[in-house]
């Protein structure tokens, strides 16, 4: 297959796009098999396509309850799709190549670099190995901790539940097997359980800060000054985007609840929208400001080169830094004594516009197609394009047009805005001559 890509000059972005599409198609076919459902009957193509897309794109939006509709085989297929989606299709392909003893070509290395947002091609195979070891280590630790809760309650079945939820949390997928306690109930029955809350939140955060950040933490530990600027920005934004939303949920949204439930609820609700999709609270009971804040968090997402989606914390940070520079009449935005490259600013602006366009158009189309109020439709749209999985309860009742919109949004959100554009639009080399410069008034 790599020879085919090389012969027809397929770009790295196009390889990523095609790779995700092929895995989704394969997952759809497997889920359509009668053995995949508890009833032993074939599930319709549309529902299987939606579920496979949601799993590969690590979103978590579902039209069929994962616990009650799908058999063990179907759940295993979904879990494998989540793992492939979280690791990245190209990363999985590279692992298979390395395990088989074959040499990784330059084209494969370039695709791997784009897939994990690595700064350079050199050492990418070693870095990929580091990523894979880290993923399975964290997922194993998460599963072992969750077994302490699920084994006493469910018996041997608790092992499967622990493994499933650990992988789903680390990959920021949001799929759950708690439907036996109530359809689409997610983790609401564990809203005050500290072990489940802390473990799931930790897995979400670790999976969402990015693989390069892991490398910095492993290499430099507490020596923060030696971290890459990107890692510093990611960790700073992660703290900010947990602390301030948690304060809002604690002091305003959940102020009527008992103290213990407020604490865990506020923390969990600040973490899960970026971009896991588990919930321990009834989101339909939230006020409009609470739903709006959750929508914004879903759009922001996690870090680049991570299991999280969204337009990324670094995108928001770059735009804020450049806005601060403009307010102070400085030429460049900066972080930690380093200037931000002009191309980075252009990319950040492009990503913001892409996500806003997809988010707003998706919400409007769903609202018009379903004759529903705009806010819950925008919430659904943000959840899909941010690959989150939170919903205000409208997903299972949506029609064909709306489901197709969500499928496209999930796919766009997982492959990444810039990757999607680079893969679908022809690129032109910069002309040797530069056009005349002229100022234009903005603001």
What are these regions (language model features)?
Residues 1-443:
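Membrane-proximal intracellular helices of multi-pass ion channels
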């Amino acid at each position: 297959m790599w020879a085919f890509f090389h012969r027809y000059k397929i770009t790295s972005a196009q390889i990523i796009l095609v790779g995700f599409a092929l895995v989704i198609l394969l997952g759809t076919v497997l889920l359509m098999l009668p053995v995949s459902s508890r009833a032993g009957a074939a599930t319709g193509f549309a529902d299987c396509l939606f579920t496979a897309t949601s799993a590969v794109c690590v979103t978590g939006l579902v039209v069929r309850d994962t616990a009650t509709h799908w058999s063990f085989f179907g759940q295993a297929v979904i879990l494998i799709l989540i793992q492939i989606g979280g690791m990245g299709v190209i990363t999985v392909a590279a692992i298979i190549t390395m395990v088989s003893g074959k040499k990784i070509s330059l084209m494969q290395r370039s695709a791997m670099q784009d897939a994990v947002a690595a700064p350079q091609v050199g050492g990418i195979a070693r870095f990929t190995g580091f990523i894979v070891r880290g993923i399975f280590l964290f997922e194993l630790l998460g599963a072992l901790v969750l077994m302490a809760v699920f084994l006493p309650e469910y018996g041997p079945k608790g092992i499967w539940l622990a493994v499933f939820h650990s992988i789903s949390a680390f990959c920021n997928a949001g799929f759950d097997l708690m439907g036996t306690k109530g359809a689409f109930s997610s983790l609401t029955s564990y809203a005050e359980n500290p072990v489940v809350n802390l473990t799931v939140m930790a897995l979400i955060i670790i999976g969402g800060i990015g693989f390069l950040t892991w490398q910095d933490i492993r290499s430099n530990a507490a020596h923060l000054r030696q971290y890459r600027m990107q890692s510093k920005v990611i960790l700073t934004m992660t703290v900010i985007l947990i602390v301030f939303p948690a304060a809002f949920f604690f002091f305003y949204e959940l102020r009527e609840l008992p103290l213990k439930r407020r604490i865990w609820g506020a923390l969990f609700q600040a973490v899960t929208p970026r971009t896991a999709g588990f919930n321990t609270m009834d989101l339909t009971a939230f006020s409009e400001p609470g739903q709006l804040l959750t929508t914004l968090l879903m759009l922001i997402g996690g870090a680049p080169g991570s299991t999280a989606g969204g337009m990324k914390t670094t995108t928001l940070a770059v735009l804020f830094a450049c806005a601060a520079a403009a307010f102070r009449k400085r030429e460049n935005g900066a972080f930690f004594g380093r200037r931000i490259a002009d191309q980075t600013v252009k990319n950040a602006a492009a990503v913001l516009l892409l996500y806003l366009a997809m988010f707003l158009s998706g919400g409007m189309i769903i609202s018009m197609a379903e004759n529903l109020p705009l806010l819950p439709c925008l919430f659904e749209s943000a959840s899909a394009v941010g690959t989150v999985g939170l919903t205000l309860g409208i997903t299972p009742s949506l029609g064909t047009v709306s489901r197709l919109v969500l499928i496209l949004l999930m796919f766009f959100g997982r492959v990444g805005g810039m990757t999607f554009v680079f893969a679908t639009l022809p690129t032109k080399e910069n002309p040797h001559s530069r056009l005349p410069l002229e100022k234009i008034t903005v603001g």
